[in-house]
Amino acid sequence: NVKVPKTHSDGISSVVGTVNRGWDVAKYLLTHERTGISAIGTSVSGGRSLGAIMNDEADGKMDTTTRAAAMKVEIDSLAVALTRERYKDMAQAGQGTGHASAMLKYVGTELNKDRHELMMSSGGSDALEWDGEFGTRPADWLRTKANSIEGGTSEVMLGIVSRRVLGLPN
């Protein structure tokens, strides 16, 4: 049990929102956090496509399977970016977006992990060097693992989507 004083020493209330409705505030904040996290899966590196980066590293000799995987991530990233824009427009128009943040957060973090996995694999064992030619790539790749925990784990996001978006039973 945690005890929080009702007021600070300067007399300002410690209560955010309504008393005994703290979970409502927490859910709102998590939704906001998830929306921000979801954007990470839609970015490209320095404005260049994943396929272009990987092709350069392979000296133009990227195999077709790897090229197809890179293009799938790029196409999925574009689809998520467009979906995020649609939900943003809906929110600005005063329409509810439901539990879209859970879906977008899950898809965004998974795409981010896929993108970094491909970039690591294209660099071979050299990409694992912490201070090597690939710069922050190893740290960025490891960071993607934390993204799937922030704002609610991927498993929690899948549970929210299955129950509240798709209406599936527990």
What is the predicted role of each segment?
Residues 27, 47-55, 71, 81-88, ...:
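Predominant activation on well-ordered alpha-helical scaffold segments within soluble catalytic domains
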Residues 34, 57, 88-91, 95, ...:
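Short amphipathic alpha-helical interaction patches enriched in hydrophobic/aromatic residues
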